[in-house]
Amino acid sequence: MKYFGTDGVRGVANQELTPELAFKVGRFGGYVLTQHADSQNAHPQVLVARDTRISGELLENALVAGLLSVGIEVLRLGVITTPAVAYLVRTQGAAAGVMITASHNPVEYNGIKYFGNDGYKLSDEMEEEIEALLDAPTDDLPRPTTDGLGTVEDYSEGSQKYIQFLEQTIADDLDGLHIAVDSANGSTSGLVSRLYADLNLDFDTIATTPNGLNINDQVGSTHPEQLQKFVVDQGAAIGLAFDGDGDRCIAVDEEGHLVDGDKIMYICGKYMAEHGRLKKDTIVTTVMSNLGMYKAMEAHDLQSVKTKVGDRYVVEEMRKSGYNLGGEQSGHIVFLDFNTTGDGLLTSLQLLHILKVTGKKLSELAADVKTYPQKLVNVKVSDKQAALTNPQVQAMIATVEKEMNGDGRVLVRPSGTEPLLRVMAEAPTEETVAAYVGRIADVVRAEVGVE
């Protein structure tokens, strides 16, 4: 697939992801949806939303025009989070949802991401049908006039429905907690005060004033430094940072220390298991989750299943094997009992609920996970697969793993997009991990590296 990456169509807005391309993605996507719709409904309904970047309206208007040209009934949600779209598609009974976002990426990027009617990403088959139309030399799709055209209306109550849904995922309110919030000047900016005020939280915010250009700019889950200072300055019990489209959440404890997605998954998984709510006592993680998390899980009889890097692989494994908690170190955490995708606000409520009912500080809850120093080195290679199977490389990995003796781990994997081999290790100290990675990377360079 050349247009749809793991997260839909992405690129620099108005240069790679042009309004012309957005129009086609709307038109061809809408057409494929009408082909798959049941016969009673001549005008399938599609929800459209965006994050706060300046290019959002440009792309939204082009995309909506494309959808209308093939008879789609469009409901515009305005600025809202990606997981809100996934939730509303299911509960609204729409044929699909479209989110215009580039998530945690810089402001000049944007993307178009489709959700199917079940709230999961579109099936590969449907994406391939859309791609085939995008690649066709001519556009031979019908061009209806009058009653064959679609209509568009604003669906402003969508965000209220989503907030009500979130509030119902925990048993009681959260009064007595003082929290600090960083909305990354993104999609959660307009939702946090309504949600947290409803739950009687005492909250202070930063980065909740989007201006179209400041999304993710030195704020949010990928830049938590401001929040770490803010938590300590405000004397908050916890800090919560979201990313641009609100599908990630990471936390900061009362001392200003980072509590990443691994630690949040562990805290939530342990609590769910204690209350008989963690299916198969298992958390689904990616290969990048830290060894410290696995050690803490083992100590409390929790199982783990590892997938490739990417939240879509986590969700696939959860659906296939019947698990209900999974996620990534980056803060993409999926509570499949409640929503079909990573949901930052949902994650924040589950964590705050645990904080309130246990009466423990976040630093105490996170203390079980001793994060191992991690080092990653990229080595340029001519052939990724040959590099992986090279006997010398294999031998050095085996030697290092033997020396680690269970107190460390090695992960060597090809980059998904570049001619690189990624050499990663975790070990108890910065010095040892650097030495281990250095030894493996040296052998990779000597055997199969290119300058």
UniProtKB/Swiss-Prot annotation:
Superkingdom of the source species: Bacteria
EC number: 5.4.2.10
Active site, renumbered: S103
Pfam families: PGM_PMM_I (PF02878), PGM_PMM_II (PF02879), PGM_PMM_III (PF02880), PGM_PMM_IV (PF00408)
PTM entry text: Activated by phosphorylation.
Cofactor binding summary note: Binds 1 Mg(2+) ion per subunit.
Coiled-coil residues: none
Catalytic activity: alpha-D-glucosamine 1-phosphate = D-glucosamine 6-phosphate
Positions bearing Phosphoserine: S103
GO BP, sorted A to Z: carbohydrate metabolic process; peptidoglycan biosynthetic process; UDP-N-acetylglucosamine biosynthetic process
Top-level EC class: isomerase
GO molecular function: magnesium ion binding; phosphoglucosamine mutase activity; phosphomannomutase activity
Positions contributing to Mg(2+) binding: S103, D243, D245, D247
Cofactor: Mg(2+)
Keywords attached to this entry: Isomerase, Magnesium, Metal-binding, Phosphoprotein
Disulfide bridge positions per record: none
GO cellular component: cytosol
The keyword Nucleotidyltransferase is annotated on this UniProt entry: no
Family: Belongs to the phosphohexose mutase family.
Its biological purpose: Catalyzes the conversion of glucosamine-6-phosphate to glucosamine-1-phosphate.
Name of this protein: Phosphoglucosamine mutase
Record organism: Levilactobacillus brevis (strain ATCC 367 / BCRC 12310 / CIP 105137 / JCM 1170 / LMG 11437 / NCIMB 947 / NCTC 947)
Gene: glmM
